[in-house]
């Protein structure tokens, strides 16, 4: 057995010994007729932050706080401790003359991680730290397991994700990330509400998985005896609301895609989609750059943020470039000069590109998109709108009047990663049905991410939908950029994980 294995075994034994000691304390309390979980409600007068912020008016006054005991340095007849609540920590001071010998002994028996209420007077130590001089206390919830930050379990990088509750307790920067996430979504709503958008809710379960090119999760509705899908996008329902007369709508919600997991993808993720009648994709660019800049300013205090040691400037206007021009800039190939699918396929021969279908089935649009992914994306570091995507890969977008081979669609990129996707929405029901039929052919060729036919959506378009601009932003990715987080797992409280056992 190696020294490392011996150390791990010793740590495991010590950890288990601590668990046994805590359980014994719990049993001892029960034997004394005390229940450490009997408290149902706590009346606290202040939080740690309120006491620190209002020290001058609270000095020498009695307060009651509650929280988790996170450090304890009590020896002999006096000592200090730290208690943590949602807002931070505050130091505690206890002295035998104030509480008596038996009560001090009881306090010393508390473990790190226990929840307690503390009553005492506010003062400052000689070093200037705002503290509470304890006059009374009560155990309100016993921690039966020690926090694992000093034990081998935390060396497993997955433990932070599997046991996020522990991660949040011991890592202040993790708590800060998720507080920022909350604020990002708050200011997203604030921005749109101020522009007279209304927030709505659309179905998570649907008989058709539409609105995006993705593989869905399938489930079965027993009462109706039909297969249903977890939504992959909110788009088609939101556009039905535009048809119904809701001229500005948005939804922030979960989407589900039955695909791979990596640092940028989680099967369950958060999107915001918004739609505005009488607007186009230029309006959506303006909304995107202004909203993201507004959120960055509110959350980070600046539109310039650091991401992986690179400064990203979100201040409008963002760079705009067409897809064709971007491919020409970074690959040297001008797709305006490519006239046929055959010519486009020749460009791929001899290159180690990953194709979603057989090369002979690829079109010029497929090859253009392939070149963009291979040569361009990684170079789009500063916020950039890539505009005018081919019709064939944009089945819900309206054609450009001056160049019908392409659509009024853009994707926003930051640090080489897609942040958002937007269109001038296709509102011609006849053309939309033709596009859906073409997508069905793509499915027959093996593209299981191609769109499904949605007859009810076609019916809605036949009722009539005004010219409309639509936008979708990946909330998780935006949070990553604004918190300098390098994995999507770092911004989702409980990311999808492979089970460690059956």
UniProtKB/Swiss-Prot annotation:
Location (main, coarse): cytoplasm
Required co-factors: Mg(2+)
Entry's localization field: Cytoplasm
UniProt EC number: 6.1.1.6
UniProt-listed GO biological process terms: lysyl-tRNA aminoacylation
Cofactor binding annotation: Binds 3 Mg(2+) ions per subunit.
Keywords recorded for this protein, A-Z: Aminoacyl-tRNA synthetase, ATP-binding, Cytoplasm, Ligase, Magnesium, Metal-binding, Nucleotide-binding, Protein biosynthesis
GO-annotated cellular components: cytosol
Binding site for Mg(2+) 1: 411, 418
The reaction(s) this protein catalyses: tRNA(Lys) + L-lysine + ATP = L-lysyl-tRNA(Lys) + AMP + diphosphate
Gene3D superfamilies in UniProt: Bira Bifunctional Protein, Domain 2, Nucleic acid-binding proteins
Top-level enzyme category: ligase
Residues given in the record as Mg(2+) 2 binding sites: 418
Pfam short name (any one): tRNA-synt_2
InterPro entries in the cross-refs: Aa-tRNA-synt_II, aa-tRNA-synth_II, aa-tRNA-synth_II/BPL/LPL, Lys-tRNA-ligase_II, Lys-tRNA-ligase_II_bac/euk, Lys-tRNA-ligase_II_N, Lys-tRNA-synth_II_C, NA-bd_OB-fold
Keyword Cytoplasm (UniProt): yes
PANTHER family tied to this protein: LYSINE--TRNA LIGASE, CHLOROPLASTIC_MITOCHONDRIAL, LYSYL-TRNA SYNTHETASE
Summary of subunit composition and partner proteins: Homodimer.
Family: Belongs to the class-II aminoacyl-tRNA synthetase family.
Name the UniProt record assigns to this protein: Lysine--tRNA ligase
Organism of this sequence: Clostridium tetani (strain Massachusetts / E88)
Name of the gene: lysS
């Amino acid at each position: 057995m190696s020294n490392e294995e011996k150390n791990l075994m010793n740590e495991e034994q010590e950890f288990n010994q601590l668990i046994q000691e805590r359980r014994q304390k719990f049993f001892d309390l029960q034997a004394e007729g005390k229940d450490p979980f009997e408290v149902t409600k706590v009346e606290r007068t202040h939080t740690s932050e309120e006491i620190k912020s209002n020290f001058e008016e609270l000095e020498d006054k009695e307060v009651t706080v509650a929280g988790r005991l996170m450090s304890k340095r009590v020896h002999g007849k006096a000592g200090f401790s730290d208690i943590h609540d949602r807002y931070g920590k505050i130091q505690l001071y206890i002295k035998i003359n104030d509480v008596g010998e038996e009560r001090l002994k009881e306090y010393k028996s508390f473990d790190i991680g226990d929840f307690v209420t503390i009553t005492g007077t506010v003062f400052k130590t000689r070093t200037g730290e705002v503290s509470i001089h304890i006059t009374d206390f009560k155990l309100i919830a016993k921690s039966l397991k020690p926090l694992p930050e000093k034990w081998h379990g935390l060396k497993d990088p997955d433990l932070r994700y599997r046991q996020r509750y522990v991660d949040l307790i011991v890592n202040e920067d993790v708590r800060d990330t998720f507080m920022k996430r909350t604020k990002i979504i708050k200011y997203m709503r604030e921005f749109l509400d101020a522009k007279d958008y209304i927030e709505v809710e659309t179905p998570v379960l649907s008989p058709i998985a539409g609105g995006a090119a993705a593989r869905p999760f399938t489930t079965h509705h027993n009462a109706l005896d039909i297969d249903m899908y977890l939504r992959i996008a909110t788009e088609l329902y939101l556009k039905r609301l535009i048809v119904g007369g809701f001229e500005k709508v948005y939804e922030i919600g979960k989407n589900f895609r039955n695909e791979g997991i990596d640092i940028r993808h989680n099967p369950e993720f958060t999107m915001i989609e918004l739609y505005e009648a009488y607007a186009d994709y230029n309006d959506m660019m303006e909304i995107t750059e202004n909203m993201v800049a507004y959120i960055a300013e509110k959350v980070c205090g600046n539109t310039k943020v650091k991401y992986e040691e690179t400064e990203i400037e979100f201040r409008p206007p963002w760079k705009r470039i067409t897809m064709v021009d971007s491919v020409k800039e970074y690959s040297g190939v001008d797709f305006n000069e490519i006239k046929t699918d055959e010519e486009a396929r020749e460009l791929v021969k001899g290159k180690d590109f990953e194709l979603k279908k057989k090369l002979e089935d690829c079109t010029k649009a497929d090859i253009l998109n392939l070149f963009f992914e291979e040569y361009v994306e990684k170079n789009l570091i500063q916020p950039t709108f890539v505009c005018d995507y081919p019709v064939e890969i944009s089945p819900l977008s309206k054609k450009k009047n001056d160049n019908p081979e392409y659509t009024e669609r853009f994707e926003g990129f930051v640090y080489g990663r897609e942040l958002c996707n937007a269109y001038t929405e296709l509102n011609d029901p006849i053309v939309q049905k033709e596009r859906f039929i073409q997508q069905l052919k793509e499915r027959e060729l093996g593209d299981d991410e191609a769109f499904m036919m949605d007859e009810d959506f076609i019916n809605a378009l036949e009722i009539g939908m005004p010219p409309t601009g639509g936008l979708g932003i990946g909330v998780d990715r935006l949070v990553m950029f604004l918190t300098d987080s390098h994995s999507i797992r770092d911004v989702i409280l409980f990311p999808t994980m492979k089970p460690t056992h059956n």
